[in-house]
């Protein structure tokens, strides 16, 4: 299971992997979770599948736990009929299921490997059925590139509490500070109030006020100063919640 909540996860983009590796290299061998989307159309080219497999297998080799965001588009791009088999091929730890799959399809996958649901779209009925059949089922909030589109405080708190009451661990995103993802370059927070906030402050807010089980920086870049502040927060506060390891 993920070593949460006393840790930080990262988001990785194939188009910026070379520049991001210098940051990720400092977290090798720690079981750090990495979120990676496998259905970003603008990244698709004739080398995409090979590059994706190389990056995912490299991350697994260095001890990272890769959560891949997948959709029907992913299956078309890789020419596969079974996402669980693709996960084995790419050495993925978990699949974050996006659009295009039925409750039964997701439940079948959840019986075989960790599954992450979309916290904004999953229904209470779906949650109960999938969690009842799955070995490890999580819910992940989205991040929001454009100003004024992120979640508000009341909605985030209520949704998170509902999902946790159903037995799911809930994950969310904070913005980076050193290298923001384009084309908007306004940060990628889950909570609109965190846009422009220091990552360490946003991390502490999600951990303490919202009781988030796992927190990922969504932008490609996090400064060493902010990474160290988050590490210190995790070490010193020792949030009084059972780890899901």
Language-model regions: role of each:
Residues 116-241:
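Catalytic alpha/beta core domains of metabolic enzymes, predominantly
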